[in-house]
Amino acid sequence: MLIRRMEDRDVEPVVELALANYDGVMAEHHSAEILAGFRADATPQSFRDQMAWKQVFVAEEAGDVVATGALADFGSAGAPKHTVSQFYVRSEFHGRGIGTRLLAHIAEAANSAGADRLHVPSSRNAIGFYERAGFSVDSGQPDAALEITWMTKPLRGPAEQARRADRP
């Protein structure tokens, strides 16, 4: 498996991946109204626009895009909020560790950006996945209207990186 930055040639496969997730795994856990909103936002132009301000990654298996996820900063200059965004794995690849490796890659990118924690707006069906990856529910960020659960994971922020660098 190869994890790399998303390129323009990946836009159509990523749109298809997002739509398949909305129609498949998420359909059992979310209202039709919420899914319709997600679907409306899953356009090629939307993903191209995101590439300009997010670190968007794809995971390839045998040359095919099988997963995608992004690192976004939804905070302000003085208060960054590093967030996992648009995270999808093709359903036939669930359980193979691809999502886990992609999420670790995104966490490392956040850590490299100086983040001390990583946030994710989890869909209802993915809460267990994120819990296994070290995230916990952040009750301070309710978002029931969008049928998502905000979760947070501590990272090795700059202070921890400095301590590790000082060790022999």
Regions found by a protein language model. Name each.
Residues 119-121, 133-153:
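Conserved catalytic-core motifs of GNAT/GCN5-like acyltransferases
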Residues 110-123:
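Conserved GNAT acetyl-CoA-binding A-motif
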Residues 13, 83, 117, 125:
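Amphipathic alpha-helical recognition patches that constitute DNA-binding helices
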Residues 93, 129-130, 135:
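Conserved hydrophobic/aromatic "anchor" residues
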Residues 1-12, 156-168:
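Conserved N-terminal entry element of GNAT/NAT acetyltransferase domains
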Residues 99, 103, 124-128, 142-149:
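Short glycine/proline-centered loop/turn elements that form peptide/ligand docking sites
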Residues 90-96, 124:
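Active-site acidic-Proline motif in GNAT/NAT acetyltransferases
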Residues 5-9, 16-92, 103-105, 109, ...:
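Acetyl-CoA-dependent GNAT
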